[in-house]
Amino acid sequence: MKNFKETYEKFKKNQTDATVAAKANLYKATLSRIKKETSPPNRNYLWALAMALELSVDETEELFAACGLCMDSQYHLTDLEKERENIIKECIANGKYNLLELNIRLYEEGYRLLGNKGTN
């Protein structure tokens, strides 16, 4: 099994880290820490990266697995977190990768936004 950095590099194609971080609404330092494995990625960051990289559902599962997580494992999530993740999964499954539009929807429905730049 590949680690996060290998999996991320496979999916980022020709994009720079700065571009991916901006599209994922993440600080560049956050992405750098995740890549160096000095900071384990949380689900929020992985979802944001999946959106920014325009991953399919299977590719998103691969990204989660590279971090030792399961995309569909919701046993430790609250009902609100499960509902939020279902909205995100729906966007990915339907190829809707506009993070701003998704964050507006999450905000309007009272959920935490994706990314860590200017989010709650």
Regions found by a protein language model. Name each.
Residues 1-18, 96-120:
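A short, Lys/Arg-rich alpha-helix, primarily the initiator
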Residues 18, 29-32, 58:
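Key DNA-contact positions within bacterial/archaeal DNA-binding proteins
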Residues 24-41, 65-68:
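Recognition helix of helix-turn-helix/homeodomain-like DNA-binding domains
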Residues 27, 42-45, 80-84:
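N-terminal alpha-helical segment
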Residues 38-52:
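Short, basic-rich loop-to-helix N-cap that marks the start of a DNA-contacting helix
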Residues 61-97, 101, 115-117:
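Short, charged recognition helix plus adjacent turn
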